[in-house]
């Protein structure tokens, strides 16, 4: 989690300037394509909803003309599918500034016993936020995954038996009410 899209150097949550809260995705194009990431992105938010502030606006930040064109094509496809104007911005990337530590992995931070396990394994902030397992668990706690998908990968998430049980309890409760579960899973699939 961090800030991008603005001109202020070294923004913080309380001194954001004209930046937007966003994430930076580092990916291996041999495993998942930019087009696939865009498809996940469009399914994972409401692109026709106008944001009430620049801080929280939905945006695609592109690095190349090719990425820009692909983002515009998929935006137009979504506008046609939804039969409405798309409010999601498509803008050139600016420097990405990592947000403060307490903003990282927000959903996971709501479950102290799981944070404690991962903090012991990843004591450095960059290792903690860069961990695939930490990111996956944060997503599950945020309601972005089904109990079925968790059960398939829980052994590889690096949790103790107690941590695994706690995560399973959380996902069981969320799975019953999750809009993502009801839609068949508009969350990032496990890369194989």
What do the predicted segments below correspond to?
Residues 1-192:
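Flexible coil/turn and secondary-structure edge motifs
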